[in-house]
Every structure is written in C-alpha cells, then in structure tokens.
C-alpha cells in the first residue's frame, strides 16, 4: 500500500479519472477516497509543508524527526488542505475518508501557541471540521468517513470504529463501541464488517454481516479477501440477502435517521437510553435498539439462537419468524439470518422494493407492515427524500 498521499489519480493507472467518476456515478456508485494528515520525507509535499510552516512543531519549536503532521490551528494549513481535497471533490469524488487523526503529538507546539496537552484531543475535531466544511461548500452536505473524534465531532458525521480484530472478541468489542459512541452524542456510526486485521473466518463474517447492515451506515473493509465472491457463490447469495434486508428497510432507516438528527439521538442506542426506567435494560451490553422500533441482538457466538432481554412492558414480535415474546429474558432462535431482530408491539414498519442502488428506489411504492400483539393500532415514521418532512403514520 502506498501511504504517500498526493491528492491525485495516478496517470499510469487512470487515463481519465473525471470520466471514470462520472460513469460510476451514473451507475449509482459514489466514490470515497482514502487519505491521512501525516507526511513523511518521501512525500512530494513534504518540502512545501516544511517551507511554509504548515506542520505541528515539536516541543522545541522545531521540525519533528520522523514526519510532519498537518496543523489545523493554522488557517494557511486549512486553506492548503481544503484546496487539495476540493480539486478531487469538484472532479466528482463523493466523500473523503478522514483516517487517523488520533496521533496528534502531545509534546508539540501548535500554530495557535498552545501545546499538545491542550490540542491533542481537539485535533480530530479540527480535522473532521476541515474536511466536512469543504465537502459541504461544494456538495451542500458535510458527509465524511472519519475514524477519530472528540466532543463536537458529531456535527461532522459519520464515524466508524477503526481496525477491529477478526475474532469474536473483536466483534463483541465493535458492538460495544457502537453503543458507547451513541451514548457520547453521535447519531451515526459504522464499522468494518467482518473485522479488519486479517482475513475474516467465514463463520464470523456470516454473523457480522446482518449486524453490519443493521447500523446506520454499512461497509466491508479489511485485509483481503473481503469481496463475498471470494468465499463462494452460496456466501455471495447470503451476502446479498443481508444487503437486501437493509434496502427493504431503507424507509425505516431514513425516517429514524431524520428523527435522530432532530433530537440528538443515536441510531444505534443502548436499551437504557430507550427504557431508562427498566432496571434490566441498564445491564445489557450486547443488544441495541436500531431506531425506536427495532431491537437487534447480534450472534456474537456460533449457535442457532441466544438469550435476549426484552425491555419495557409491551410484547415483542420476531421480525423474521413472527413469533411473539413477553418482556424479560427469552431464549430466541434465529430466523433465516443469524441474528435476532424484534419489533416493538404497536409498530408499523415501512418497506420499499429492492433496487440496484438507493438512487433507483421507488419511494412511491412504500408498503407498511403492522406488528401487533396486544396493541390495537400501529404507528410508524415516514420521511420522503424529496421533502425531508418527518411524518407520524397511524394505521388501525
């Protein structure tokens, strides 16, 4: 992997990158490019950054020994960096992966005169803002794909959990990290489905997939192979079913996301956040509410089912099997996908026909499914992309 970012498509590999991006966009693909804010002496921009003083100085006010880190407290650094990214965005790039950022030096002097002791935690916030601002200026929205964050970074979504181990421990830690960042005020979050560090075992990949698709933003990323066809046709078909689960639920995801942004709620929320008066909800760390109506319990270990705590006083209906469960602890067998998904009694969940990409979804073809046990009517939320207005729908 070439870590030397030059903010340009290699001429020997991309004859016409602008046309390539246009062609991809016409097929429903939005391109996201990776980069980082660190520059070694091998990088073509290293001399310029040093000459113009756009880097974080060491504790003696001098050039660091190994590499330079962009200093986002310096307005000239921000201008230089946004110009590089802006050229790519104007070319047709959809988003920028804002990798790293947690490695801001503590023993350092920043352009604003403050030390690393003060600026270390603020570094990812400034980093997130710098990228989000240029994307919003050119695209009208400030979507990024960031790894590091600090208080305030929730204004610049979205963030993902970093390099998870391809183990069951890594899977469990990923679930907990998603719940933790939600409690920290972040609406949206993603993770590397299957883990990152080494090739993911197929059994783990299978269980991680439905969880990954039942988060606000889904992506597969890590040590190769991650493409499903490398695991065989049967796995590819299974991967497609997991993806289609989310695509069918896109009206639910979209409406719940809108409600989250209006109220500051996380899409992935701990049970205690939704049910603070239920003592049992405070003890559960491996389940979550996906929006206000769906409870998700990932299969963190191999098996056909798991124990699930159902909060509140209402009943719950299994999304896959239709079985009804009382609140409290239940052992629940999985349906066709290795994950437990339950719908709160009295919920109406909107669905949409599967499409090749979200651009092609037919929002005039939404259907509603009622989930009723003891309740007499069902309610749900709807938000259409064309008007962005959140509506509460009641179905007798």
Segments (PLM) and residue ranges:
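Catalytic core of carbohydrate-active enzymes
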Residues: 132-134, 141-142, 149-160, 173-177, ...
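Aromatic- and carboxylate-enriched substrate-binding clefts and catalytic-loop regions
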Residues: 1-239, 274-276
């Amino acid at each position: 992997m070439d870590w030397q970012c030059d903010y340009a498509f290699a001429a020997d590999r991309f004859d016409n990158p602008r046309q390539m991006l246009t062609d991809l966009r016409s097929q429903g693909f939005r391109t996201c490019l990776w980069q980082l804010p660190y520059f070694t002496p091998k990088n073509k921009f290293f001399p310029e950054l040093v000459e113009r003083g756009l880097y974080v100085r060491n504790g003696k006010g001098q050039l660091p020994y190994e590499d330079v880190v962009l200093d986002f407290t310096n307005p000239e650094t921000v201008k230089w960096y946004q110009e590089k990214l802006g050229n790519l965005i104007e070319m047709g790039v959809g988003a920028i992966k804002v990798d790293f950022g947690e490695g801001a030096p503590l023993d350092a002097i920043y352009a604003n005169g403050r030390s690393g002791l003060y600026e270390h935690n603020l570094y990812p916030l400034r980093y997130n803002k710098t990228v989000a601002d240029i994307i919003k200026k050119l695209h009208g929205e400030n979507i990024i794909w960031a790894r590091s964050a600090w208080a305030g970074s929730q204004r610049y979504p979205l963030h993902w959990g970093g390099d998870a181990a391809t183990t069951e421990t890594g899977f469990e830690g990923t679930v907990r990290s998603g719940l933790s960042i939600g409690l920290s005020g972040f609406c949206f979050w993603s993770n590397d489905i299957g883990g990152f560090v080494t090739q993911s075992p197929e059994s783990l990949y299978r269980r991680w997939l439905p969880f990954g698709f039942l988060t606000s933003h889904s992506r597969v990323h890590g040590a190769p192979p991650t493409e499903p066809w490398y695991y065989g046709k049967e796995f590819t078909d299974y991967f497609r079913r997991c993806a289609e689960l989310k695509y069918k639920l896109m009206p639910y995801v979209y409406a719940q996301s809108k409600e989250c942004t209006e109220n500051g709620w996380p899409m992935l929320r701990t049970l205690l956040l939704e049910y603070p008066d239920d003592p049992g909800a405070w003890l559960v760390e491996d389940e979550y509410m996906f929006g206000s109506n769906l409870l998700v319990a990932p299969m963190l270990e191999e098996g056909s089912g798991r124990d699930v705590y159902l909060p509140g006083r209402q009943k719950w209906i299994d999304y896959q099997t239709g079985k009804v469960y009382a609140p409290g602890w239940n052992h629940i067998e999985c349906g066709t996908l290795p994950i437990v998904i339950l719908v709160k009694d009295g919920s109406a969940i909107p669905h949409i026909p599967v499409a090749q990409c979200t651009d092609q979804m037919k929002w005039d073809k939404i259907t509603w499914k009622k989930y009723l046990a003891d309740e007499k009517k069902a309610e749900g939320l709807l938000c259409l992309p064309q008007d962005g207005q959140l509506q509460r729908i009641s179905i007798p």
